[in-house]
């Protein structure tokens, strides 16, 4: 039998799941295995499946799967449509040739895209006029995909545009699909063998300045951000919030006037960290606040450098509009969503308590989060993990998979659900759900993660539409486990992945809002009948070590959301298991501690002490050949406050670069 529908042969079970849902695919495969195989025939250029119960499904040439006609009476997608494709694939499996796969040419779709409604093409042109940038992925053997600022497009068939899926509310043949095809065509014309590229769309009819600071609005934004940075470094964030209110407000309004989404989002995140510091929030992290402040200024500096390279004919690594998030919408409506939990974190401060649950869309790999908070007075009777969200207990959501209709995603990755858009189903999280996920979220081991962290762009140019320090790693064996009472932290060292240096450090601090999480972690790592096989969590550098803070631990049979534990589990083992940091690590930790001290208390209140500490530290850094960082610390004595602030920001960024480099060296 000759293959008349090559696009159907390209649809993998993962693609069919994305185009329909996991339930239809699972049931279809089971029915085919049980012998319920429909009769496949062709009639008038249409593929027809006739089932034993009389149901007839017809898919015409050029139709999307959901456009197929089926006599079962189902509204929209049904299992018969999925079984038609799977049966056709099985029928063709024995007759397919083993010819080498032809190179993908998305240009074949341009003519078809030109026939789309005017409204769709105008929306695409409007996005191009804003200078939109698109991240393209085309690795051999994998599904071509395009990541736009607020949506993701995947081409499940290289033969038919009808099987392209976007996660926006339209789902397919939308303006995002149009732009993705155009970007691939333009990029392949210059780099035929591309596997990963960031491509900027340019309009022939609209010209915009190549210098982001050439106009008054851009220049004002940079000045207000610099003034805010100077005020925070010199005065310290421990000063009353009223001291910084006006500076934050001016910078935020200036970023919004420029429509620079990642600059305004950086300001929002920094303000949230400062507020968390004053509210004594359990989720406040001094190192994170330090990075946010340094990256804010560096983002604008990088934008100017990218614009400069572009102006002299060089191709910048990242377009400046991507760096600042130019023209990115605040919200985007999403299509039918199937989300897999990555974990939950409970938190509290002096007035409120709350939680945040992270999910990933297995079809696109994007990460979303769901957040809620309540008055602290309700915490004793209603702990965060037992609160109900959309009629489901938070703990069940944290350890489950959810399906939602007509949701929205904010620019920072928050999942927005109105009361009427309730979650339609929640099922327990299974190991199979995580196995469907791919890199960079799911890494094959700690060695691969170190390499990924070393190679990825610095934080100051990465987009802020989702968290990028959340990963899933394999766990083979727990080597050591102990409770550090001085740090109130449970530490473990486990084998993760292949390689010589494959020891992963897990560290989970105790928290009053999830007091039994550490006990559950200890119990899971000690059990042998159903050992931990995978772990999700946030990576950072603790005591000089690349460390993962666990959120969910997956055994062979089930998932355990650690912060969802509401009862005592087992006593904690008492021992210190972390290795003594190397001299180089200790120096970087001293440098980071000095910068945190300056951030908290302000330069002007500890100038002489800070200069003395910086000079001593610079001498020690020079002894281990950290000459650049030593030079930066030497600039702290500079009498010009602007130069000193720039030096402190550079010190933060250098430490961030050096920690992964030391890890890579072992």
Where are these regions (language model features)?
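Long, low-complexity, compositionally biased intrinsically disordered regions
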Residues: 1-666
């Amino acid at each position: 039998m000759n293959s008349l529908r090559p696009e159907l042969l390209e649809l993998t079970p993962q693609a069919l799941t994305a185009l329909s849902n996991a339930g239809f695919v699972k049931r279809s495969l089971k029915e085919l295995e049980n012998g319920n195989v429909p009769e496949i025939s062709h009639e008038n250029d249409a593929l027809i499946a006739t089932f034993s119960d009389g149901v007839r499904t017809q898919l015409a040439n050029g139709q999307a799967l959901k456009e197929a006609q089926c006599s079962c009476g189902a509204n929209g997608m049904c299992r018969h449509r999925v079984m038609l494709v799977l049966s056709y694939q099985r029928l063709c499996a024995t007759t397919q040739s083993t010819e080498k796969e032809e190179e993908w040419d998305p240009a074949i779709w341009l003519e078809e895209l030109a026939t789309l409604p005017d409204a769709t093409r105008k929306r695409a042109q409007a996005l191009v006029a804003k200078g939109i940038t698109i991240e393209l992925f085309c690795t051999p053997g994998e599904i071509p995909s395009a990541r736009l600022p607020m949506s993701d497009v995947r081409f499940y068939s290289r033969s038919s545009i009808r099987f392209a899926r976007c996660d926006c509310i339209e789902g397919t043949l939308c303006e995002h699909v149009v732009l993705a095809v155009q970007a691939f065509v333009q990029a392949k014309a210059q780099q035929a063998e591309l596997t990963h590229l960031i491509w900027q769309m340019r309009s022939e009819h609209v010209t915009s300045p190549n210098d982001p600071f050439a106009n008054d609005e851009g220049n004002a934004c940079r000045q207000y951000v610099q003034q805010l940075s100077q005020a925070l470094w010199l005065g310290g964030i421990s000063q009353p919030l009223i001291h910084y209110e006006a500076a934050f407000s001016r910078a935020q309004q200036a970023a919004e006037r420029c429509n620079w989404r990642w600059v305004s989002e950086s300001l929002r995140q920094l303000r949230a960290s400062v507020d968390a510091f004053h509210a004594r929030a359990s989720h406040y992290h001094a190192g994170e606040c330090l990075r946010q402040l340094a990256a804010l200024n560096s983002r604008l500096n990088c934008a100017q450098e990218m614009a400069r390279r572009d102006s002299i004919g060089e191709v910048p690594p990242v377009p400046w509009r991507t760096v600042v998030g130019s023209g990115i919408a605040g919200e985007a409506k999403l299509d039918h969503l199937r989300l897999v939990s990555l974990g939950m974190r409970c938190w509290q401060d002096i007035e409120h308590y709350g939680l945040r649950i992270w999910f990933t869309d297995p079809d696109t790999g994007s990460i979303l989060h769901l957040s809620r908070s309540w008055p602290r007075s309700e915490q004793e009777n209603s702990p965060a993990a037992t609160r109900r969200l959309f009629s489901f207990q938070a703990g069940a959501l944290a350890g489950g998979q959810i399906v939602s209709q007509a949701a929205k995603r904010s620019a920072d990755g928050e999942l927005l659900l109105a009361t009427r858009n309730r979650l339609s189903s929640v099922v327990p999280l299974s190991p199979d759900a995580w196995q469907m996920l791919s890199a960079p979220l799911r890494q094959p081991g700690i060695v691969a993660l170190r390499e990924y962290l070393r190679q990825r762009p610095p934080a100051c140019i990465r987009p802020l539409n989702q968290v990028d320090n959340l990963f899933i790693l394999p766990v083979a064996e727990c080597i050591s486990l102990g409770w550090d009472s001085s740090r109130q932290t449970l530490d473990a060292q486990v084998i993760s992945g292949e390689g010589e240096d494959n020891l992963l450090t897990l560290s989970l601090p105790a928290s009053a809002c999830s007091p039994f999480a550490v006990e559950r972690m200890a119990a899971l790592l000690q059990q042998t009948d159903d050992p931990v096989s995978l772990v999700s969590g946030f990576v950072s550098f603790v005591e000089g070590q690349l460390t993962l803070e666990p959120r969910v631990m997956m055994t062979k049979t089930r998932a355990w959301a650690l912060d969802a534990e509401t009862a005592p589990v087992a006593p904690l083992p008492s021992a210190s298991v972390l290795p003594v940091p190397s001299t180089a690590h200790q120096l970087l930790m001293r440098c980071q501690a000095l910068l945190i001290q300056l951030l908290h208390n302000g330069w002007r209140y500890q100038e002489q002490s800070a200069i003395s500490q910086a000079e001593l530290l610079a001498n020690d850094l020079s002894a281990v050949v950290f000459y650049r960082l030593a030079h930066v610390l030497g600039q702290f004595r500079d009498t010009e406050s602007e130069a000193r602030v720039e030096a402190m920001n550079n010190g933060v960024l250098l430490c961030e670069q050096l920690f992964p480099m030391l890890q890579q060296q072992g």
